[in-house]
Amino acid sequence: MKQGTTGMYCEVGPCTNAKDAHSPCLRPPGYAKPPTVRVCRTRGHNLPLSKVPGPKLAALTKWYGFYHNVIRDGQYSLSFSSLHKKYDSPVIRIGPNAVHVDDPSFYQEMFSMTTKYYKEPEFYKALGAEGAMASILDPKHHRMYRNHLRPLFASRAVDGVVPRLKLELEKATRIFDMHRKDYHPLNIQALYRSFTSDMVCELLFGESPDFIGDGNGYHPFVAALDRFTAFSWLVVYFPWVKSIQFHLPFGLGDKLAPEFNDFKRQCETWEAKAQLKRESGVQVGQKNLFDYYAELGAGPETAVSGVAQPVEDAFNFLTAGTESTAYTLSSTAFHILNNPQVFKKLHEELDASVDFIRNDFNAKQIQALPYLGAVLKETMRLSTAVPGNLPRLVPPGGVTVGSVYLPEGTYPQQTIVSSSHLSIITNDTIFHDPYKFKPERWLGEEGKDLERWHVGFSRGPRRCIGSSLAYLELFCVTAYVFSRFEMSLFETDESSMQWVDRISARNRKDVQVRILSDRWEKEAHSIAGGTLLKEE
């Protein structure tokens, strides 16, 4: 329900009589009256988008997208490529006022630093807390907010968590060893979720909950976090679902969602400490996310306003930093183990770099390894963490794509346009043999030319703010794990790695491995044995 020029506006039109029993004003949250024949005819035939090809049901109702995203579990964006081919058009209609564009030059325009394409309000406000980074629509406001938080995610701050990363790797090693000795398969994706959760918490809050230290490395909170992401599309269509989660009374929340309630309590403690520090004017140690929240709205009138729901925003940061990085780490492990030549070349590079991986751990040198970098970029291309739609509004004056004109539309039927990362990473005019895992494409002159198409962290002013931490984890974890352990895939293949689009990608089954040996331990025994023989 939205405020229109003639009163309240709902899915089927203006409402000027709030006393009417059928008024949208009196309908419960989440209610959506099925579109009438008149509305369907208007949507399908009379709107300016009527000439854009696409499924007829998609033109009539947004519930067509609901069916493919919610009921069929994230299948809609996977169908766009075949729809573009079916209708032989770079633009297809995917909703009553929404289109998808498969055109690399348009993608570059939409995600440029000077883009005029603003975020689509309903999608992003459903996912982000009010006033939070994900839901800020105005570019100027977003830039101010991002600049305010930038020090927290800057390279210098990320460098400060390297000691924690080394500690996390040592804890992970114990879990690897346990599975090696028992010869039990290891769910490495679950382990990586705990690892990345700890690292994000260390950066955001200045302390880690030690999720990875929980026995098998899969803390109940991290498991709950994984389950929560399964409902991402449901939250987009019914935003109140997420609100319920964060506004349950503690007594009821402890019964229905104890892990989230524990996190909520901890966040409220951090928030209270931050307010106390701001009021006292005494800042001890590194500022955390809640310290930055406390400063919002405290400056001049031009300053960024505060976040209405800081706990929810903190949860969004944690979810984004956990799931996407863990998915990329797991996909990297799969691609390395599934491609013997890649495995061989990577081992050669890692073995030549043992001085700063094993002997004197140096994150900067690890992040400069060329072939490892190419492997990670190719993983982010072929297994991109956010493959689907990031919807935007067509700017004033409209835009022409090929021979198709897209009008800006009028409220509330503004034209929504998207150009998915999937359409870029599988484009055979950009990437030769796009479905093949070829790290070499990112090396040499070809690699320099492809850099503008490295979209793993998106592009433009809305690019992932946490990319520095993600890169640190991707490089250092992959280098350490594959330098130290011999392993093989267990019940993991191309079919289990097929993904669904839950805003972020989710493979059908977690990546599992068998730990075959500890190479460093074998080398230590070999050296010790050689020394003993010499003494004899």
Swiss-Prot record:
<dbReference type="InterPro" id="IPR050121">
    <property type="entry name" value="Cytochrome_P450_monoxygenase"/>
</dbReference>
<keyword id="KW-0503">Monooxygenase</keyword>
<comment type="function">
    <text>Cytochrome P450 monooxygenase; part of the gene cluster that mediates the biosynthesis of paraherquamide, a fungal indole alkaloid that belongs to a family of natural products containing a characteristic bicyclo[2.2.2]diazaoctane core. The first steps in the biosynthesis of paraherquamide is the production of the beta-methyl-proline precursor from L-isoleucine. They require oxidation of a terminally hydroxylated L-isoleucine to the corresponding aldehyde by enzymes which have still to be identified.</text>
</comment>
<protein>
    <recommendedName>
        <fullName>Cytochrome P450 monooxygenase phqM</fullName>
        <ecNumber>1.-.-.-</ecNumber>
    </recommendedName>
</protein>
<dbReference type="InterPro" id="IPR036396">
    <property type="entry name" value="Cyt_P450_sf"/>
</dbReference>
<dbReference type="InterPro" id="IPR017972">
    <property type="entry name" value="Cyt_P450_CS"/>
</dbReference>
<keyword id="KW-0408">Iron</keyword>
<keyword id="KW-0479">Metal-binding</keyword>
<comment type="similarity">
    <text>Belongs to the cytochrome P450 family.</text>
</comment>
<dbReference type="GO" id="GO:0016705">
    <property type="term" value="F:oxidoreductase activity, acting on paired donors, with incorporation or reduction of molecular oxygen"/>
</dbReference>
<dbReference type="InterPro" id="IPR001128">
    <property type="entry name" value="Cyt_P450"/>
</dbReference>
<dbReference type="GO" id="GO:0004497">
    <property type="term" value="F:monooxygenase activity"/>
</dbReference>
<keyword id="KW-0349">Heme</keyword>
<dbReference type="GO" id="GO:0020037">
    <property type="term" value="F:heme binding"/>
</dbReference>
<dbReference type="GO" id="GO:0043386">
    <property type="term" value="P:mycotoxin biosynthetic process"/>
</dbReference>
<dbReference type="GO" id="GO:0005506">
    <property type="term" value="F:iron ion binding"/>
</dbReference>
<keyword id="KW-0560">Oxidoreductase</keyword>
<comment type="pathway">
    <text>Alkaloid biosynthesis.</text>
</comment>
<dbReference type="Pfam" id="PF00067">
    <property type="entry name" value="p450"/>
</dbReference>
<feature type="binding site" description="axial binding residue">
    <location>
        <position position="464"/>
    </location>
    <ligand>
        <name>heme</name>
    </ligand>
</feature>
<dbReference type="InterPro" id="IPR002401">
    <property type="entry name" value="Cyt_P450_E_grp-I"/>
</dbReference>
